UniProtKB/Swiss-Prot annotation:
It comes from the Eukaryota. Residues 95-122, 186-253, 266-290, 590-614, 854-962 are annotated as: Disordered. Component of a ribonucleoprotein complex containing mRNAs and RNA-binding proteins including DDX5, HNRNPH2 and SRSF1 as well as ARVCF. Interacts (via the extreme C-terminus) with FRMPD2 (via the PDZ 2 domain). Interacts with CCDC85B. A motif (Nuclear localization signal) lies at residues 607-623. This is Splicing regulator ARVCF. Residues 8-46 form a coiled coil.
Length: 962
């Protein structure tokens, strides 16, 4: 029994080795046969290629092709291809005897009766005979260059025909593996696919329907050698490809057609009917041609997504319904085929020779399609349609497309989310607020904030923040954005991109701010919402890390001398808005409040001035009274070096940083370095807000501006030919002049520039340079504040020839506000008896000043409810009507800055102010800093139209909003 087991094992081992050797020998023989047959076919093909046809030197119109069918193991797919072949019919039978090389051993062990054991080993050599039969025959070719399968002779059996792949490469046509049928006397055919070590030695699959390679600019066609089934041959006609529909010119570059559904492939499903809710003749179902490889799809800009690659390979879940599939490719860029043609669908090619664009209801219906690529490309095409087209935006809202797009923001596929957000960005752009309200009503703001928290793709974050920036220009949406997105915008974007760290490492260098598009969009959004009102300002001030991060970003910009970009502009505007009414709204402001001046503060100041002027230095009692009341009414010590700032037990943070004297140097640096008009206006406005109010910190701010040599910077900016810069600087100087020392310096060195602006209001130096009413009123109010309680400043006004300019303005101005403000200044000048003699010598009579004063109402010097002004940044005028009308096929992503995301809103115009106070007098020379940059040249700063406050009976401080 034991001998039988040993014998059986040995036999099995020998049989296995025999089979291995047999197949090895068979392989060698087949390889030799391949070379032999390939050589014969190549020799037979050369005469036909040389001789041509009809003596014209051209190849024969009827090409000799071999239709090869590969039959693999059961369950494998068949592939069809065409290849050149010799002109003769060849039928061969090859018999190969295979020597395994290593003989098979049979071992037997026999034990005799005497106990001896005998081992016998027998070597057996087996020969395997394999018969390989090949049949090569001529296949007729039709006029379209394709094999005639219908009505032609049967293809016949296809026996073994695995030609050498080197021949296939030399043949000049597409290649495919041939079917093989091994007839062997022993052993089975090895299972598994054959090795494919060459990319050209591949077989095609009917069911996969993969994209063909980009063989040339037009892509592969039927003439490129790919076999087309007869039933779908009409979809790929031979000859020139159909061009774009009439009236549509070809795009000049790849970016010209970035969006839209693709229609250059079609499924081989049984039914070619349109998808649900679509017209039957709209051929958006994919037509699939056999693959000859896969080409590369270039893109105009980086367009990555988390799982965008999955969309490219997705197949419809319902094979029997030819759903309107879009081109399955990543990104919003169209196929390269779109550059030169648009292939018609099978259905529409029979009815309409041209491909038609989808209707808007069809595009919106695709947003509900079960196939994700359809949703993604429909949203991208919708974004393309909405670009600079207010009518389409309105129709999308009327057809209730906005809720569909908002719902796609929570889609599991990143590509769908990205394209839906891009469509919402375009739909929310513009002055029409109906779309913004519709997005709010369907929960668009919370959905965008959720997407921002979840997205890690930079482009998605740009789209989300850009959409929020658009929505933030709509007044009712500002608090909605604050409620749902303030924390996310701050902690996800502002803090990380600003370079600020809550716990900085002392050993490492502070990080610089990153001026990314995401940061620009987010800061623009916060810039808009910061102008909503007191509650919005309170929420932003108390948001942890926001003020710290914004100041760090501005310090980084000043350090790198990069102060002209939009991100810096947005940050300064936010700081200006948050500084508005800071003396009233911040927690604990009551502790720092100083005594409010009475309504007759100017008269009290005049009495104090006359009492102090009783002697050369003033009376002793007056000096002692002033010393003990040191900082009353905003006054400060004559010697600035003795001004003690509050002692700190810990570093300031959060909203406390808004009004610290240290920020003065930052704003002055921006005023010195920047050439951006909006940045200059915002920085001057921030100083204007901080120096307003009767509290201790305003006193410190006014003194710090003088100490940091900021007065020459502001005075020089009065020469700017940009209207809004002159206005902001004039109001800032008015607030700073509440400091007595500042008033004397400004009166001596700024009066000439102020008077020049008054003259320009009457006679502009050039066409279009006329100052606006608000600017003229601001300049006149500043002059009035300077000459009040200051005889020397009134003399400076006379020396600057200001009286003739004021009288002419009263007589000729069409503005009631300008005339009243000028009358108040003239009335104040005539009140100084010391100047009346000089005025009369110059030919001025009392009647001139009385007639001017008769037009003014109210007590002398009471130009407004207060003597200082604080405001927020005016709302940026988007000027959509002045935009360039670019191609509707290109969405200017970089051009959608604050001018593109903000809209004009004239509803918020609330004048604010408080009373003025005089200060002790002391004069010091105003020195210019030689190291400071000169102001930007005038011609580069055109006048900017600004929404102004509604005219009032009294001159009102400018109070405008972002």
């Amino acid at each position: 029994m034991e001998d039988c087991n040993v014998h059986s094992a040995a036999s099995i081992l020998a049989s296995v080795k025999e089979q291995e050797a047999r197949f090895e020998r068979l392989t060698r023989a087949l390889e030799q046969e391949r070379r032999h047959v390939a050589l014969q076919l190549e020799r037979a093909q050369q005469p036909g290629m040389v001789s041509g046809g009809m003596g014209s030197g051209q190849p024969l119109p009827m090409a000799w092709q071999q239709l090869v069918l590969q039959e693999q193991s059961p369950g494998s797919q068949a592939s069809l291809a065409t290849m050149p072949e010799a002109p003769d019919v060849l039928e061969e039978t090859v018999t190969v005897e295979e020597d395994p090389g290593t003989p098979t051993s049979h071992v037997s062990i026999v034990t005799s009766e005497d106990g001896t054991t005998r081992r016998t080993e027998t070597k057996v050599t087996k020969t395997v005979k394999t018969v390989t039969t090949r049949t090569v025959r001529q296949v007729p070719v039709g006029p379209d260059g394709l094999p005639l399968l219908d009505g032609g002779p049967p293809l016949g059996p296809f026996a073994d025909g695995a030609l050498d792949r080197h021949f296939l490469l030399r043949g000049g046509g597409p290649v495919a593996t041939l079917s093989r049928a091994y007839l062997s006397s022993g052993g089975g055919f090895p299972e598994g696919p054959e090795p494919r070590d060459s990319p050209s030695y591949g077989s095609l699959s009917r069911g996969l329907g993969m994209r063909p390679p980009r063989a040339g600019p037009l892509g592969p066609g039927p003439g490129d050698g790919c076999f087309t089934l007869p039933g779908h041959r009409e979809a790929f006609p031979v000859g020139p490809e159909p061009g774009p529909p009439g009236g549509r010119s070809l795009p000049e570059r790849f970016q010209a057609e970035p969006y839209g559904l693709e229609d250059d492939t079609r499924s081989l499903a049984a039914d070619d009917e349109g998808g649900p809710e679509l017209e039957p003749d709209y051929g958006t179902a994919t037509r699939r041609r056999p693959e000859c490889g896969r080409g590369l799809h270039t893109r105009a800009y980086e367009d990555t997504a988390d799982d965008g690659g999955e969309l490219a390979d997705e197949r419809p879940a319902f094979p029997m319904v030819t759903a309107p599939l879009a081109q399955p490719e990543r990104g919003s860029m169209g196929s390269l085929d779109r550059l030169v043609r648009r292939s018609p669908s099978v259905d529409s090619a029979r009815k309409e020779p041209r491909w038609r664009d989808p209707e808007l209801p069809e595009v919106l219906a695709m947003l509900r399609h079960p196939v994700d690529p359809v949703k993604a490309n429909a949203a991208a095409y919708l974004q393309h349609l909405c670009f600079e087209n207010e009518g389409v935006k309105r129709r999308v809202r009327q057809l209730r497309g906005l809720p569909l797009l908002v719902a796609l923001l929570d889609h599991p596929r990143a590509e769908v989310r990205r394209r839906a957000c891009g469509a919402l960005r375009n739909l929310s752009y513009g002055r029409d607020t109906d779309n913004k309200a519709a997005i709010r009503d369907c929960g668009g703001v919370p959905a965008l904030v959720r997407l921002l928290r979840a997205a890690r793709d930079n482009e998605v974050r740009e789209l989300v923040t850009g959409t929020l920036w658009n929505l933030s220009s709509y007044e009712p949406l500002k608090m909605v954005i604050i409620d749902h997105g303030l924390q996310t915008l701050t902690h996800e974007v502002i803090v990380p991109h600003s370079g600020w760290e809550r716990e900085p490492n002392e050993d490492s260098k502070p990080r610089d701010a990153e001026w990314t598009t995401v940061f620009k969009n987010t800061s623009g959004c916060l810039r808009n919402v910061s102008s909503d009102g007191a509650e919005a300002r309170r929420r932003l001030r108390e948001c942890e890390g926001l003020v710290d991060a914004l100041l760090h970003a501005l310090q980084s910009a000043v350090g790198r001398k990069d102060t002209d970009n939009k991100s810096v502009e947005n940050c300064v505007c936010i700081m200006r808005n948050l500084s508005y009414h800071v003396h009233k709204e911040v927690p604990g402001a009551d502790r720092y409040q100083e005594a409010e001046p009475g309504p007759l503060g100017s008269a009290v100041g005049s009495q104090r001035r006359r009492r102090d002027d009783a002697s050369c230095f003033g009376g002793k009692k007056a000096k002692e009274e002033w010393f003990h009341q040191g900082k009353k009414d905003g006054e400060m010590d004559r010697n600035f070096d003795t001004l003690d700032l509050p002692k700190r037990t810990e570093a300031a943070k959060g909203f406390e940083l808004l009004y610290q004297p240290e920020v003065v140097r930052l704003y002055l640096s921006l005023l010195t370095e920047s050439r951006n008009f909006n940045t200059l206006e915002a920085a001057a406005g921030a100083l204007q807000n901080l120096s307003a109010g009767n509290w201790m910190w305003a006193t410190y701010i006014r003194a710090t501006v003088r100490k940091e040599r900021g007065l020459p910077v502001l005075v020089e900016l009065l020469q700017s030919e940009t209207d809004k810069v002159v206005r902001a600087v004039a109001i800032a100087l008015r607030n700073l002049s509440l400091d007595r020392r500042n008033k004397d310096l400004i009166g001596s060195y700024a009066m000439a520039e102020l008077v020049r602006n008054v003259r320009n209001a009457q006679a502009p130096p050039r066409p279009g340079a006329c100052l606006e009413e608000d600017t003229v009123v601001a300049v006149l109010n500043t002059i009035h504040e300077i000459v009040s309680d200051s005889l020397d400043n009134a003399r400076s006004l006379l020396q600057a020839r200001g009286v003739p300019a004021l009288v002419a303005l009263v007589a000729s101005s069409q503005s009631v506000r300008e005339a009243k403000a000028a009358s108040h200044v003239l009335q104040t000048v005539w009140s100084y008896k010391e100047l009346r003699g000089t005025l009369q010598k110059d030919g001025w009579t009392k009647a001139r000043f009385q007639s001017a004063a008769a037009t003014a109402k109210g007590p002398k010097g009471a130009l407004s409810p207060g003597g200082f002004d604080d405001s927020t940044l005016p709302l940026v005028d988007k000027s959509l009507e002045g935009e360039k009308t670019g191609s509707r096929d290109v969405i200017p992503m970089d051009a959608l800055g604050p001018d593109g995301y903000s809209t004009v809103d004239r509803r918020e115009r609330r004048p604010r102010g408080a009373s003025s106070a005089g200060e002790a007098s002391e004069k010091e020379p105003l020195k210019l800093d030689p190291s400071r940059k000169a102001p930007p040249p005038g011609p580069s700063r055109p006048a900017v139209r600004l929404v102004d406050a509604v005219g009032d009976a009294k001159p009102q401080p400018v109070d405008s909003w972002v």
